[in-house]
Amino acid sequence: MNPGETILTTAWPTSLDAIVLAGTDSNPKRMVQGRNKAFLEVGGKVLVRRVVEALLGASSIGLVFVVGPAQRLRKVLDGRSDELVIVDQVGKMLANTWAAIHASEARCLSGENGVDPERPLLIISCDLPLISPTAVDDFIARCARAENATQTRFSLFGGVAEEASLRRYYPVEGKPGIKRPYVHFSQELLRLANIYVARPRKLSHQEFLQTGFSYRKAKDWRNVLSLVGSYLGRSGGWKAAWLTLRLQATLMASRRGRGLYRWMRKGNSLERVELAMGALLGGTVKMIITPYGGFSLDVDDEEDFRVLNQRFDDWSTI
């Protein structure tokens, strides 16, 4: 599908608050050029500012909460809308996310109603130079449509990008590009996008999100094995461990392109992954395929930073 063919339809009755994760810790692997990625410039603009501006321009977004080093964030986001709230970081990813969730909940509390666990929030990373208001609105609309179609109040929607939406960012005609590994499902090749819609209070095992984030680089077998080990002893852990190893083995088999690969891929369904993730997280999970591949192109390392800067003018119009 062409990203221009957006499906802007009625989503939820009210706009969603957005949480932008712009925090950092002392781990140098989380930084690029020794810096918090939020404050890098791509295309002549600081990344976190670019993300915030896209969110503020999206019709489906209400308030935007940015969590990170508050003093530095105020400097680069000075002069932005009253719909922007800066939240000081308190620790690692999950702790920072909850600091922003609490700030959002505090803004919507009224009388004795208390916190509404059914209220969805958008959660997104700060280092997405190819984000746009249209892409954000489209993703939220797809989440709402999936929910309406199944009559299920999902706890978590996770964005995934398909190969067709990422081919345009490959190296071509002597120009640099970005090509990353995919998860090989029976119907398509997918990779995670850095955008989610969540009802965080409906996830009873949220602590696993931090574990998954720490070991998310599946191209490193040490991370894969560490992730699999973290599953064991949890509800649904053995099934999730087996599925993770199967998906990784399918990726390895794809390099040979023979019968074993075709057989393994045939059994890899997105629905199985959704059920396994839901069991681990203690909630219902739905993966949403976005036609906007830019959600998957974060500034992962210094090479990505260089390529995204070099190709920004070409790619920002896609």
List the predicted regions and their residue ranges.
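Short catalytic helix/loop segments, enriched in acidic residues and glycine
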Residues: 34-52
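Short phosphate-binding loop-to-helix
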Residues: 78-120, 130-131, 138
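Short, polar loop motifs at secondary-structure junctions
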Residues: 67-73
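N-terminal nucleotide-binding beta1-loop-alpha1 segment
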Residues: 1-33
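Active-site acidic Asp-centered loop
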Residues: 124-126
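Conserved core of the sugar-phosphate nucleotidyltransferase
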Residues: 133-278, 290-293
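Short, acidic, metal-binding catalytic loop of nucleotide-sugar glycosyltransferases
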Residues: 54-61
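ATP/nucleoside-binding phosphotransfer catalytic cores, i.e., glycine-rich phosphate-binding loops
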Residues: 271-318
